[in-house]
Amino acid sequence: MIHLGHILFLLLLPVAAAQTTPGERSSLPAFYPGTSGSCSGCGSLSLPLLAGLVAADAVASLLIVGAVFLCARPRRSPAQEDGKVYINMPGRG
């Protein structure tokens, strides 16, 4: 089961990532990939694009949850037909 602390961490992770400035040097070693410190070719995302990405992510997540719900729910067993004649069951035929 997922703990509330993990959900809170996942919700606050984008906020922490947004607080960092592009090109900021990290405390990782220089040989670590992606720590050059430059942000050439990086651009800020426009607000409508960012809102669209968040909305698309939410819709995709809801579709996945719906598909899992439909596939994982218990199936109904077919109704028994009492009109059948059973040889070894007295009183039913």
From Swiss-Prot:
Transmembrane intervals: 49-69
Inducers of expression: By T-cell receptor (TCR) ligation, which leads to enhanced KLRK1-HCST cell surface expression. Down-regulated by IL21/interleukin-21 in T-cells and NK cells.
Compartments it resides in: Membrane
Coiled coil: none
Alphabetized Pfam families for the sequence: DAP10
GO cellular component: cell surface; plasma membrane
Extracellular face of the membrane: 19-48
Signal peptide limits: 1-18
Membrane topology, as annotated: Single-pass type I membrane protein
Region of interest (PIK3R1 binding site), ranges: 86-89
Residue numbers bearing the Phosphotyrosine modification: Y86
GO MF, one example: phosphatidylinositol 3-kinase binding
PTM description: Phosphorylated; PIK3R1 and GRB2 associate specifically with tyrosine-phosphorylated HCST. O-glycosylated.
Keywords: Disulfide bond, Glycoprotein, Membrane, Phosphoprotein, Signal, Transmembrane, Transmembrane helix
UniProt keyword Phosphoprotein, yes or no: yes
A GO biological process held by the record: positive regulation of phosphatidylinositol 3-kinase/protein kinase B signal transduction
Described purpose of this protein according to its UniProt entry: Transmembrane adapter protein which associates with KLRK1 to form an activation receptor KLRK1-HCST in lymphoid and myeloid cells; this receptor plays a major role in triggering cytotoxicity against target cells expressing cell surface ligands such as MHC class I chain-related MICA and MICB, and UL16-binding proteins (ULBPs); these ligands are up-regulated by stress conditions and pathological state such as viral infection and tumor transformation. Functions as a docking site for PI3-kinase PIK3R1 and GRB2.
Further remarks about this protein from its record: Silencing of HCST suppresses cytolytic activity of T-cells and NK cells.
Subunit field text: Interacts with CLEC5A. Forms an CLEC5A/TYROBP/HCST trimolecular complex depending almost solely on TYROBP. Homodimer; Disulfide-linked. Heterohexamer composed of four subunits of HCST/DAP10 and two subunits of KLRK1. Interacts (via transmembrane domain) with KLRK1 (via transmembrane domain); the interaction is required for KLRK1 NK cell surface and induces NK cell-mediated cytotoxicity. Interacts with PIK3R1 and GRB2. Interacts with CD300H.
Record-stated family: Belongs to the DAP10 family.
Protein name per Swiss-Prot or TrEMBL: Hematopoietic cell signal transducer
Organism taxonomic ancestry: Eukaryota, Metazoa, Chordata, Craniata, Vertebrata
